[in-house]
Regions:
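Phosphate-binding loop of NTP-binding sites
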Residues: 15-18, 57-61, 70-130
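Glycine-centered flexibility sites
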Residues: 2-9, 53, 71, 109-112
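ATP-dependent carboxylate-amine ligase
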Residues: 1-49, 61-66, 84-87, 118, ...
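Conserved beta-strand termini and adjacent loop/short-helix elements that scaffold enzyme active sites
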Residues: 26, 51-55, 92
Length: 130
């Protein structure tokens, strides 16, 4: 729900399609507004079903998983429909954590993330050389 223009929905769509998911992309923006995002999906776009410029309630009643763009308000009537029909609500981060099989190291905070990430990289390269 919400392909978006900034890349998150695009990467998630490509990953889902690559792994054989049956994908419906629905966004309130129309095809013209999303043309660059659709183009970025590339050859995989033909595997998806698009509902653009509107949402269809049936999509939220019949799909098992709804991947929600962070810009979509939590009180959206379509998310309520999905919840009422027992769909799992996911986002790109929750999908990543669900399907990533490797250990994850996360670095958060206001300052020092790049330095900390570089130190972690340095330590791991010494411990696990290729």
């Amino acid at each position: 729900m919400g392909l978006g223009l900034l890349g998150g929905g695009i990467a998630t769509t490509k990953w889902l399609l690559k792994h054989g998911a049956k994908v419906t992309i629905t966004d309130l923006k129309d095809k013209k507004a999303l043309s660059s995002s659709i183009k970025t999906i590339g050859k995989h776009a033909k595997l998806a079903r698009f509902v653009l410029g509107r949402h269809d309630e049936k999509d939220f009643k019949t799909n098992e998983i709804i991947v929600v763009n962070p810009a979509v308000p939590k009180e959206s009537k379509f998310l309520k429909i999905a919840r009422d029909h027992k769909a799992k609500l996911e986002n790109e981060a929750s999908l990543f954590f669900r399907f990533c099989e490797n250990p994850i190291i996360a670095v958060t905070g206001t300052r020092g993330k790049t330095t900390t990430a570089n130190w972690i990289r340095h330590i791991l390269k010494q411990k696990y050389p290729r």
